Each structure stands twice: as structure tokens, then as C-alpha cells.
Amino acid sequence: MSGWRKIYYKLLNLPLKLLVKSKVIPADPVVELGLDPSRPILYVLPYNSQADLLTLRAKCLALGLPDPSQSFEFNGVELPSHVFINDGPRVFRYYVPKQKSVKLFHDYLDLHRANPDLDVQMVPVSVMFGRSPGREGHSQATPHLRLLNGIEKFFAVLWLGRDSFVRFSSPVSLRYMATEHGTDKTIAHKLARVARMHFSRQRLAAVGPRLPVRQELFNKLLDSKAIKKAVDDEARSKKISHEKAQQNAIALMEEIAADFSYEAVRLSDRVLSWTWNRLYQGINVHNAERVRQLAQDGHGIVYVPCHRSHMDYLLLSYVLYHQGLVPPHIAAGINLNFWPAGPIFRRLGAFFIRRTFKGNKLYSTIFREYLGELFARGYSVEYFMEGGRSRTGRLLEPKTGTLAMTIQAMLRGGTRPITLVPIYVGYEHVMEVGTYAKELRGAVKEKEGFMQMVRGLRKLRNLGQGYVNFGEPLPLTTYLNQHVPQWRDAIDPIEAQRPSWLTPTVQDISMDIMVRINNSAAANAMNLCSTALLASRQRSLTREQMQEQLDCYLQLLRQVPYHKDITVPKKTADELLEHALSMNKFEVEKDSIGDIIILPREQAVLMTYYRNNIQHLLVLPSLIASIVIHHRRITLAEVVRQIALIYPLLQSELFLHYSKEQLPGVLETLANELVQQQLLCSRDGELAINPPRIRTLQLLSAGVRETLQRYAITLSLLCANPEINRGTLEKESRNMAQRLSVLHGINAPEFFDKAVFSTLVATLRTEGYITDSAEAAQGDIVAIYNILGDLITPEVRLTIESASSSAEMEAESQAVEETTQE
């Protein structure tokens, strides 16, 4: 680099250091993209901009990557380490210098042809200042989406320097290009052309399509044939004028539609960045690259997260924005449309949805058409398939209405492929968890409002870590092609279609999405420590026992991972325990022997929420441990047989991904891991307990204890009264569970949750154990109950069976009474 250029860079660097604070995407490109800092890199930038180059240089030096401003020398040949695809405009538009990118690509390819050992990494990098997509109807493109001259760039850096990012893309091996495609000038031209297309798609993925003018959007919706027909029906059914019906339609659009504002997003990003840094010790994001690739490939993206907290709305938009993606339009419950939250959420992309559409055809038509318009325009959308926040920490049964509308939007004949992206959201502290416990105990849900929001904000402190894991995407077109090959026959651009295959397909997709959410779960210090302490009947463990138990969980999750998308802490058991203690949820008592970790009684109910977040990850090893402890010695084949009978119930309740065919192999691998940890012994083809490690094995088995007790309750009632109807079975099961929780100190609110028993009874019906005519397959029911009865304590079994007998006698006396009356 010449002396004059060094001086120029130093002078330009001074204001950039003050004005620019860029975020690197992905956060660690060396690890996430597989960049090799020891090998030479050719950085490819879209525009000729020294500000972009110096911004990139600062980030490269911080990441330990080669300096893009330094020349690359090899065998006496010196070439620049960066290339601009477009030389860019100048203040005087008529002066356009000759492009150098094709020549430089050709020089690099030539160098590879002459030197077989050389392998330069070509890395596309885009530097963006600001991400406003602009409004429809504005003819002038927004500055950062086109090539800027020097003056425009100066003002972009001045105004948007702290809203900028440096986006690294996956490297391309020039050795591979030279070997596979040759080194002539046509390949160099092709590289430049592909790079130009790459950057164009990347910009669109980062900023999204232009935002609509709200009134013009409403006018377009009113002109749609579906809404015109719904307005006519409204006027006729309510006997009002057409103008009044149209005013009703506009009022509903005002209630529903978002009013997205880039400036509001920028401002909220500043506020949230400040807030997260003070409330959270870190936000952990995994697998975001798969979503960035979908956006870049032109997919319409529907984000489908689990719903833990009202914080989800803000956290997900914040994470997506910082991953270089457009914040989505979010379907938010109408209960959040209160001042001042409602207007703020609306400006950040929220559109509001009522709890039910029943009895309001105009509302359902407008909502469906609005959602279809969002997809048609290319906006990403986010909705919570569970319908509401989980009060138990587990995934809820999915509500399928919005998903059905998503598929109906595809049936309008759009060309953009729509892909569902499941997201696992996890926290070490959920601010509403105390309220959830009260609601599960029967308290009335408090209505959202300004004062409740203020009270909630006062509780925000020491929230630990947050986790956002992007699961495996589900492309709807691919899914429908595989499962409903004739789906395109139902395409109609005007009328909303409800083909016969829609309802079962939507149900299957929704269950698949819930499974994929659980496949990307995040284990953390809080849910692992809660699992260990709640496994102890006294809710207390010595520090040594706690560390040993955490080690057991960590080894299981690392050696036999539930799924490739789950995340497991890299910290040791001791480090996780120290972090959990810093959250002030547990107490430590010291005596002459050592420390005792205690979960206070008032905290125990709340901690079940965090345990339930990851219960599905450990339920099978827990079940193996429980069976071996009861039998003392048992063959693996018998363990597999017993679990295979119980597994369908667990699979439905916890959205487990293993098929029945995969189950034996998975159980064998888990059993081998327990033997490896010396929790079990393997002798003469049998599994047996290892007495020195029995305490750890007992704590592991306790993870499934309450689940087995619940199953035993329902199956005991079925054994006692095979003709009991589904509604009564659910009600009696809940009543007995409440009784059991009082008599045996079961301190988990979800133990008698209505939704849990509803799912259980529905699964028994699906598996053929009961029918719609309220008949039970008695032999099968008794076989499963005998297995469950052996795995619960004699005291609990006695309580269940005596209560079942009482329920049976009551049912018989009621039947006799009804017969007498007849």
C-alpha cells in the first residue's frame, strides 16, 4: 500500500471510528461459515466504496482475518485482496470508469492455473448502512439500495452509521472453480454476474419489499371479490346499507392491519439493545444461517415460534433484525391492543387477531385476505401456533386456523414458495411464571393493560440467558407435493378454497411443526438444575450430588443427543451450578460437611415450568432408569417392549420425534450410555442397577414419575369402568389428579392440567384403546396399567385404585338410579 493511500485511509478512518458501529453477520463467521484465517481471502464487495472497505477492514482485523486493504503476494505476483463488483457512480453521472472486477477475477483464476497448490477463498461481503425499504408509490429508490456517490455515502454514514452491518457469505474455493470450470475470461464474467445477483438477493432479504401506503392497501382489499361479497352478505344479513357495511369492513381493517415503520424499528432497536444488555446476560442464537439462505432464495417465510412470554414478540424481532433479516409482520392477540403497547406493536409490525372468528364472516374474510396480501407482497409473517402462552412450560396442542389460512393463501396461485420456520424460544427466567402458576391453580387471568405492563416492567431484573434456536424449515410446496399431489387442482385466485384434504393436512403439518420446535430445544443451567432438584423428594441435594446429576444429564445430551438441532451448554456441571445459583432461585445451606443446595417450597412450583421446557429430552432415559430400578434385573428386549406400549402416550404429549421403528435402536443406544456412565451394569444380556450409583439413577428416573402417575390415573379409571365416556374420563382423571397432588405432595400445577388429560384421552382413542362409543379394549388397557402400576410407588398406586373403585361404585349407583327412574 502506497504512503499516500495509508494517509488517506487514516484520515477516513477517524470519522468512521466515531460514526460507525457495525454488527457482524454471522457473529462468528470463522466458525459458522468455515473461513480459514490461515489461507488467503479475496473479499468481494458490491460497490466501490472506501467507507465500506474500511468498515470491513476493522471487522476483519477484530476477527483475526486477513486485511482486505493489503495486497496478496504469491510467487512474485501481487494482486489486491478485495474487489468491487460495481465501480459505482460519481457526483458527475456521465463519468463511469471501466470495471476492474472481471479482470481481477481472471488474474486470480490464471494464478490458480499456474500454481496447483494455491487455494484462495473468495468471500462475498456486503456492508449496509440503514435498511429502510421505502414506501410504495415513491419512484426514487432508498439510498442504501442503490449505488451511492461520495456525497450520498457521507450522509448515509453520518445518519445510519450505527444502524449498519457487515454480512459475510459462505466462501467459494477459487481452486475448485479453476479445476472444475476452467480459468478463461468467460468464467471470470460468470463469477462477476453471479456475485451481482447474490448481492441483489441479499439486499432484498435484508430490507424486504417496499411498505404499503395503508389507505391504498385498504382500497385494494375492498376491491377484492371475496371482501366485496362479504360486505354484500354483511349488509343483507344485518339489514344495513352497503355504505355502513363497508364502513364496518374498514373499521375491521383498521383493527387488524399493521402500520410498519422502519424508523420505529430503528428506535426500538436502540431501546431494546440497551434493555437486553442490562436484563439478559446474553441472547444465544443458533441456526440463523438456514433462515438467511431461505430469505436470499426468495422464499416467503412464516416464523412459527413456541410461545413462552409476552417478551417473545420483541425478542424475536430483535434477533431477526440483528441477523440481517427483515422483522416480520406478527400476529398478536387482540388483548395486546391497549395504549400505549398496541400502537407501538403495530408500528413494529404487529397485526392483531381475535381469539375466535366464529359467527363473523366479514372479519374472517378480511383477515384471510389481509394475510394473503402479506404473502403476495413478499413480507415475512410470524404467528404462534399454540394460540397463547404456555402456562406449563410444555408445548400446547396447536391451533390450526392461521396455518389453514396460510395454505389457503397458497391456493390463490402465488408464485413465491412459502416455508414454515419453527423456532424454539427459551429463557432462564420468564417474568410471567408466577402468574401462570396461579392461573393453573384456578385464578382468573388478569386482563392485559397499561398498569399490568408497568407492574411487569418493575419485575424485570437478572433474567439470565435467552435462547432462540431456529429449527428445521418446512417448505409447504414440497410437503404438499409429497402428501397431496393433486393440491394444485384447488387453486382459485378469487374464492377461498376448503378442499377435503385441507383439514387433515393442516393437522399433520401443525403436529410436525411442534415436533420440529422441540427438536431445537435449548438445555441451560436453570432447566437442568430445576430438573435435578425437583427429582429429589426433599427438593435438596448436596453440592456433590448436584454436580453428579448435572454431569449425568450433560453426558446423556452430548453423547446421545435427542436431535442434531438441540443445544447443550458447553460449561461444566460446576460452572452451570454457579450460574444457576447467581439467579437467586435456590438457597445454599452450609454445614461442617459441605454445601446443601435447596429449592424453597414457594419456588418449587415455579421451577416446574423450566423443567418442563426440556422434559422431552430426558424422558426416555428416565423411563429406562425407572423400569430397571423396579425390576432390579431385566433384559433390554423387555425394557423395549414395555416402553413401546407407553411410548404413543409420551409421543403425543411431548411431541417426540422418534418413530415406532426407530424406538428400539434409540433405547439400546441410551441403555449403552447409562452403562457407560456406570449407572447400570450389563450382565448376561440383562441390565441391572449398579448400587454405588443408585442415587443418581433414582434421580434420573424421577423425571418421568409424575407423567407415569397421570397415565396410571386415567388407565385405572378405564380398567374400573370400560364404558366411561371421554368427557367423564377427562373430568374424573383431573379430579383424581388434584386429590393425589394433595395427598402425596405433588407440587406441579400441570399435574392436573385440563389440556394434558385431553391429549391423553385423545391419544388413547387414536391408538384404538377406546372408541367413540365409549368402549375400552380391556385386555390392552389392563396390560399397560400393570406396567404403569409397577413403576409408581405402592402408596400412590393404592390411592389411585381406591379412588377408581369409588368412582366405579358411584357410576354403578348412578346407573341403577337412572334405571329405577325409567
Curated annotation (Swiss-Prot):
Keywords: Acyltransferase, Cell inner membrane, Cell membrane, Lipid biosynthesis, Lipid metabolism, Membrane, Phospholipid biosynthesis, Phospholipid metabolism, Transferase. InterPro entries: GPAT/DHAPAT, GPAT/DHAPAT_C, GPAT/DHAPAT_LPLAT, GPAT_PlsB, Plipid/glycerol_acylTrfase. It catalyses: sn-glycerol 3-phosphate + an acyl-CoA = a 1-acyl-sn-glycero-3-phosphate + CoA. One of its GO terms (molecular function) is glycerol-3-phosphate O-acyltransferase activity. It is a peripheral membrane protein. It is an enzyme of class 2 (transferase). Signal peptide: none annotated. GO terms for cellular component: plasma membrane. It is found in: Cell inner membrane. Its main location: membrane. Pathway: Phospholipid metabolism; CDP-diacylglycerol biosynthesis; CDP-diacylglycerol from sn-glycerol 3-phosphate: step 1/3. Its EC number is 2.3.1.15. Residues 803-822 are annotated as: Disordered. A motif (HXXXXD motif) lies at residues 306-311. GO terms for biological process: CDP-diacylglycerol biosynthetic process; fatty acid metabolic process. The keyword Endoplasmic reticulum does not apply. The keyword Lipid biosynthesis applies. Belongs to the GPAT/DAPAT family. The HXXXXD motif is essential for acyltransferase activity and may constitute the binding site for the phosphate moiety of the glycerol-3-phosphate. This is Glycerol-3-phosphate acyltransferase. It comes from Pectobacterium carotovorum subsp. carotovorum (strain PC1).
